[in-house]
Amino acid sequence: MNTVRVTFLLVFVLAVSLGQADKDENRMEMQEKTEQGKSYLDFAENLLLQKLEELEAKLLEEDSEESRNSRQKRCIGEGVPCDENDPRCCSGLVCLKPTLHGIWYKSYYCYRK
């Protein structure tokens, strides 16, 4: 019975002493991994930031193209039917209801101001 106790005590002492050494090693390993993890996070953050900047540049480029193409390309000349809600009469013309001619075709025409 004494040999069992001595053996158990010896195994217990070895486990405690080796466990503490492992604890210190584990602490150092965890610290190294944490530092590596921070560098990985910084790398991933920079990569994500670059992708977002590229997307933003593309979106701004598309907006500038739209603004260049957004001007009115064609306009309606004098005496041509127009839409009251969306008048596309040329500059110097106004979309008005006709007085005599054309009252039976459409309700609005482009006239000089």
Curated annotation (Swiss-Prot):
Gene Ontology terms for molecular function: sodium channel inhibitor activity; toxin activity
Coiled coil regions, renumbered to chain: none
InterPro entries referenced in this protein's UniProt entry, alphabetically: Toxin_22
GO annotation, cellular component aspect: extracellular region
Propeptide segment residues: 22-74
Cleavable signal peptide: 1-21
Family according to the record: Belongs to the neurotoxin 14 (magi-1) family. 01 (HNTX-16) subfamily.
Record protein name field: U11-theraphotoxin-Hhn1f
Lineage: Eukaryota, Metazoa, Ecdysozoa, Arthropoda, Chelicerata
